[in-house]
């Protein structure tokens, strides 16, 4: 808000599931949980065969209307060690983390000519 722009995304590994207090605190502060809106049955992390989202995308009300897609890009969690994917030991993009990256597509409001 220092810059006067209310379009805010909070993105990262929150190490908490949707029902846990840290996530609920952010939602209660007025941020929309974009993962729950666009990919509520998806996952970005798997541990002992339990899949879920620890990686979150939250949007301020003005930004939430500009978010058009949120979803995990499954290039890590689905490639586990028993299948021969060893972390960082080959030249592929697979299994470099225990989390999948979360992709976000936004459609920003066009700038008016007076702002150019």
Give residue spans per PLM region.
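Metal-dependent phosphoester-hydrolase catalytic domains
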Residues: 1-9, 14-111
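Proline-enriched interdomain boundary motifs that mark the N-terminal boundary
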Residues: 112-116
């Amino acid at each position: 808000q220092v810059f006067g722009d209310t379009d805010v995304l909070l993105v990262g590994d929150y190490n908490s599931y949707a029902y846990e207090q840290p996530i609920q605190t952010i939602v209660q502060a007025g941020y929309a949980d974009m993962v729950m809106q666009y990919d509520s049955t998806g996952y970005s992390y798997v541990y002992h065969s339990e899949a879920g989202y620890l990686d979150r995308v939250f949007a301020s009300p003005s930004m939430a209307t500009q978010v058009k897609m949120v979803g995990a890009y499954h290039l890590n969690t689905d490639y586990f060690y028993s299948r021969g994917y060893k972390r960082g030991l080959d030249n592929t993009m697979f299994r470099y983390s225990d989390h999948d990256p979360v992709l976000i597509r936004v459609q920003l409001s066009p700038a008016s000519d007076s702002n150019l």
